[in-house]
Amino acid sequence: MENLSELFGQYAFNDSMMQKRLPKETYKALKRTIEQGRSLDPAVAGVVANAMKDWALEMGATHYTHWFQPMTGVTAEKHDAFITPLKDGKVLLEFGGKELVRGEPDASSFPSGGLRATFEARGYTAWDPTSYAFIKEGTLCIPTAFCSYGGQALDKKTPLLRSMQALNKQALRILRLFGNKEAVRVFPTVGPEQEYFLVDKEVYRKRPDLVVTGRTLFGAKPPKGQELEDHYFGVIKPRVQAFMKDLNTELWKLGILAKTEHNEVAPAQHEMAPIFTTVNIAADHNQLTMDIMKKVADRHGMVCLLHEKPFEGVNGSGKHNNYALSTDTGVNLLDPGDTPSENAQFLVFLSAIIAAVDDYQDLMRVAVASAGNDHRLGANEAPPAIISIFLGDELNEIIESIVNASKYEAHERDQMKLGVHILPRFPKDSTDRNRTSPFAFTGNKFEFRSLGSAQSISGPNVILNTAIADTLMKMADELEGAEDMTTAVDALIRKTLSAHMRIIFNGNGYDQAWVEEAKRRGLLNLPTTVDALPYYVAPKNIALFERQKVFTREEVESRYEIKMETYIKVIDIEALSTIDISRHLILPAAIAYAKDVAATINMKKSVAPELEAEAEKALLSNLTAQTNALYKATDRLEAVLKAGDEGADMLERARYTRDKVITAMDEVRAAGDALEGIVGKSYWPMPTYQDLLTSV
């Protein structure tokens, strides 16, 4: 491998490349745009485009694309060659400021939730200069926002940038009140931990459910799953290690800060975590990471599964969204310092986040709602569907002392003593970790743990940014009119924390007692996507988005429609796949096995009537019963699907899908899995869980 420092970012048009390629004044103008959010001069765009093209051609690129993130949850791109024809039959290689700054993809073929009709095809992509352009497979990719002809956001990047703008505005107001005149920008930094499964490609291809839906719709429990807890942080297998090495190289070339890799809890499950970066860049990088994971896995004869629950009975995959607030002067506003009880600025931002999560706990749940994630949340492997905040012992004691107006007694930091003289002593952290909390403070950041592994991080961060911005706005309004700043800050912190103590929970989120306690506290428990999504369009939430200029009412309603429709379609596809596998694979296999068992019984009788065939008869009886059960359950599922009212209200259709279709699917699976336990291995038409989870 090349020298890592030389390898890193070689396929990204990053700051060092800009400095090298751009005239000094052009570079300064572009940096002002990136760092201060100023509009870009069209003349500057032309110079940047030309430098970008020359660099891309030297790196072997032949095409360029406006790379964007529509509301499908995956990325989109249309490739155009740099060539322009000349009269003599030759071509000129061109790429100007207009091509860099703006594109015009068809907007009618992407999900719009009613924002665009099929005949209203014009849409625009607009360059996001804060996220570096990069070269992928011979194409110069320019990160862009995507909007309609009328200016409505049709993507995930536009609202994220709007929410960053709102948060920056309100956070700076707070900083100015604390006398900070140096900071020009406040921005969220995020590091998303990405979980995934790896399975052998040939084994995967023999599982039509995995191929079509991303998860197994049938599968009996294997003899060994994750019971021994020996996979987590275990020795990485050579084939997986080779994949990880290749993945790191690909990510580093693009300037993605891949940092940590390890085995996760479930067999064949792993994790990759990057270093923090600005949230819109982190979102772009995470989308790229998921795409590259799949391609690198394919090169290694494997398939990377990003579904939240590919296998029943072992842990699913999530994505921990580590969230902090930083200034352009390098200050982390969520760092409590050595004496958090005396750090008023930290306590203002902390109390703002606590209030935001409490006031908009419904939106926090909406942000992570999907058919796939419903399998994880609250299943003793992921945080519960009830949103709460874990702060740890030290911060909890500080907050209680503020609320109760009592004196906080600071504790001296203990030293870790391991009972072995040769081992070093080191300061013990002020709090333990709580893996059952959906939103946990972990020293100098919050970790939002409810995200599903396949989802874009943009949506959850839009909601976090917007809710925090709104709370900071109210705080700034109150403090700016205060006569005595110190007294006003103390009173504001106490009032805010007192009003939102219910959202703080430091206990076991998996415990059923917490469900009852949360209900007493008035916290929402929204176990499924269908329960959560109506809150997206609640009047208070639409008002929030409009107040912070992140979404219009129409944009919120469109996202509600898209998420609801996606939920219905995903489960319909799973149901149809369940029927197909049952009828064309499992039932024929069970019948063929039953036929051979029956033939064995008859053969015994004909050869030696005195020979007993009790085992065969019992097996045949069980086979027949389970085969009949599967046949009937499959027919019921088909009838349930046909009975669904296509003309019904979207919410009613979603409720029908959740209550009827999923229940009918579960019955088919139960019968199919029972048959897997008794049908001979050589007859079974698909690789088993044991085959899949030990295939790499």
Regions found by a protein language model. Give the residues of each.
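Catalytic pocket of metal/acid-base enzymes, prominently hydrolases
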Residues: 1-27, 41, 122-142, 442, ...
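Glycine-rich, acidic/polar active-site loops that bind/position phosphate-bearing ligands
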Residues: 121-306, 315-318, 325-561
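Gly-rich Lys/Arg/Thr-decorated short loops/hinges at beta-loop-alpha junctions or inter-strand turns
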Residues: 1-14, 33-35, 223-232
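Active-site proximal loops enriched in glycine and acidic residues that flank catalytic Cys/His/Asp
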Residues: 44, 68, 96-97, 262, ...
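Active-site core of metal-dependent hydrolases
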Residues: 7-120
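C-terminal amphipathic alpha-helical interaction region
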Residues: 493, 498-696
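Short linear, low-complexity motifs centered on an aromatic residue
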Residues: 73-88, 108, 207, 214-216, ...
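Hydrophobic/aromatic-rich, well-ordered segments within soluble, folded domains that form packed cores
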Residues: 57, 61, 65-69, 283-299, ...
